[in-house]
Amino acid sequence: VGQHPIIGQLQYFLLKIGKGFSFVGRQKRITIANRHYYIDLVFYNRLLRCFVLIDLKTGELDHSDIGQMNFYLNYFKENEKHEDENEPIGLILCAKKDDILQSMF
């Protein structure tokens, strides 16, 4: 619930200054084995020719967040990516910083 204003601001920021970004979805639902999962923001970058998945976290980054993003990236590789496109990129943005764990996939 607290993430929604941040999601909107990030979406606006990327669409205004990010070259090649096209909005795909907010709280994008994917279904695997009859279970629903939600990715905070999904963009497609025409210049990079790949999906960009963004997950927002209110706390510090931990290993389960990284595993979750890898899960989303694998789903997009298998189900959304076309043969002529590059592999998706994942970004995890956290409200709290941990110097050891910072991720961009």
Briefly describe each language-model feature range:
Residues V1-F105:
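Charged, terminal alpha-helix-loop-beta segments
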